[in-house]
From Swiss-Prot:
Catalyzes the conversion of heme O to heme A by two successive hydroxylations of the methyl group at C8. The first hydroxylation forms heme I, the second hydroxylation results in an unstable dihydroxymethyl group, which spontaneously dehydrates, resulting in the formyl group of heme A. Its cofactor is heme b. PANTHER family: CYTOCHROME C OXIDASE ASSEMBLY PROTEIN COX15 (PTHR23289), CYTOCHROME C OXIDASE ASSEMBLY PROTEIN COX15 HOMOLOG (PTHR23289:SF2). This is Heme A synthase. The chain crosses the membrane at residues 7-27, 92-112, 118-138, 159-179, 190-210, 253-273, 280-300, 302-322. One of its GO terms (biological process) is heme A biosynthetic process. Belongs to the COX15/CtaA family. Type 2 subfamily. Pfam families: COX15-CtaA. It catalyses: Fe(II)-heme o + 2 A + H2O = Fe(II)-heme a + 2 AH2. Its EC number is 1.17.99.9.
């Protein structure tokens, strides 16, 4: 069945907005703006402070946070406005993305431009979007209590929900756009390719742990860490008794290790699968690796770090596209328009 052009465009817009949201979220984190708004008001919060009195009230709320006491006690009102506006844009864009995604679903369903299976799939995405927003606030709350930073575990959870949401959206878009499973490959090679894409997801989550711990601000050389491939501190007995994912050295080393593993595993895929999608995925993996190294040696330059974060999603998108093109031996070809009427 022919995909409805409007549905395809809508899904493409939602995917693009999700990537832009990732960029905005990265900039929010890198500029330490995320804790500047201390309340979660999904409806009232659409309107920003108006007038100096309103701004001073918001700054007074910020003054009660650990971040203010430890890092920003001398912040001026103008500087506070700057970080507040960044977080405000982050939240406002999230609301806009939710509206752009959710509002057309009833129309497309009633006019039978999408079938029940696709409606169910899209409702799962909507649920993930709501969970992602709630997780964002749950993450922010962790930085408003004792420490002047959010929990790196909650940050990783926040990103992981975005990964799930984007993956389903992107897969739906590819099917609507007519991408078919036309290249036959062995089960072993298919599952190897899928495992490399899975490693990419794991690496993105590890990147969130690195970001949450500010681990990128240390060991700013590559490939050595403190003059060695494997730093001596990794052999500490204390590290292996429950503190591994809390340790800056361990988390950064793990992020480096998985990055190299992905490059090594992705390198043979184009020769095994013989598809342009595999070459595109390998190119994205290589560029993402170089962006990661550049971010590290630049001591987390904001532009490089933001590009590194969003290009992780581009690499994931290339991986999902690669898998969509593959058909395992013995399976039937998957139509590029499943779920569309």
């Amino acid at each position: 069945m022919k995909a409805h052009f409007g549905v395809t465009v809508w899904l493409g817009v939602c995917c693009s907005m999700t990537l832009l949201m990732v960029v905005i979220g990265g900039i929010t984190r890198l500029t330490h703006s995320g804790l500047s708004i201390t309340e979660w008001q999904p409806i009232v919060g659409v309107v920003p402070p108006i007038g100096d009195e309103a701004w001073l009230r918001e700054k007074e709320k910020y003054a009660q946070t650990p971040e203010y006491r430890h890092r920003a006690a001398d912040i001026s009102l103008d500087d506070f406005k700057r970080i507040y506006i960044i977080e405000y844009i982050h939240r406002l864009f999230g609301r806009a993305l939710g509206a752009v995604f959710c509002l057309p679903i009833p129309y497309f369903a009633i006019t039978k431009r999408i079938d029940r299976a696709m409606v169910a799939k899209l409702l799962i995405v909507a649920l993930l979007g709501g969970m992602q927003g709630a997780m964002g606030w749950f993450m922010v709350k962790s930085g408003l209590v004792d420490t002047p930073r959010v929990s790196h575990y909650r940050l990783a959870g926040h990103l992981f929900l975005t990964i799930l949401l984007f993956s389903i959206l992107w897969h739906s878009f590819l099917r609507c756009a007519g991408v078919r499973s036309t290249t036959t490959t062995t089960n072993a090679r298919f599952f190897t390719a899928a495992a490399v894409v899975g490693l990419t997801v794991l690496q993105m989550v590890l990147g969130a742990l690195v970001a949450g711990l500010d681990a990128g601000l240390t060991y700013n050389t590559f490939p050595l860490m403190d003059g060695a491939i494997i730093p001596q501190s990794l052999f500490s007995a204390k590290l292996w008794h429950g503190g591994f994912l809390h340790d800056v050295t361990a988390v950064q080393f793990l992020h480096r290790l998985v990055a190299v593993l992905i490059v090594v595993c992705a390198a043979p895929l184009p020769f095994w699968l013989k598809t342009r999608g595999a070459w595109l995925f390998l190119a994205c993996v290589a560029l993402q690796f170089l962006l990661g190294v550049a971010t590290l040696v630049s001591v987390v330059h904001i532009f490089l770090a933001a590009m590194h974060q969003v290009f992780g999603f581009v690499t994931l998108a290339a991986g999902v596209h690669m898998l969509c093109r593959l058909r395992r031996e013995g399976s039937t070809c998957i139509s590029g328009h499943a779920g569309i009427s």
